[in-house]
């Protein structure tokens, strides 16, 4: 599935528990997320949270913001068993 927002295109690369809701994603999306290569959306207490991650090859990214740390982030900061999704930005 292709998602377009603010002239950027994303594809869903992972989804757990029917986590993706396009309407909720578009209403929570902030322009600051445009700079990231990946966006994680997770649900907690009926609220969608969005967090950006960079590609591992991005030398300016801190360790915690690299996509290879996303499983650790899910374990540490998300509710156990929560619904979530991961989007990857499609570069032209």
How would you label these PLM feature ranges?
Residues 1-44:
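N-terminal leader/targeting segments and the first structural element of proteins
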Residues 11-13, 51, 86-88:
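Residues in well-ordered beta-strands of folded domains
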Residues 34, 41-58:
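N-terminal interaction modules that seed assembly of large macromolecular complexes
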Residues 19, 23, 60-65:
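Ordered, soluble secondary-structure elements with a strong preference for glycine-centered loop motifs
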Residues 62-92:
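Helix-rich interaction surfaces within compact, conserved domain-sized segments
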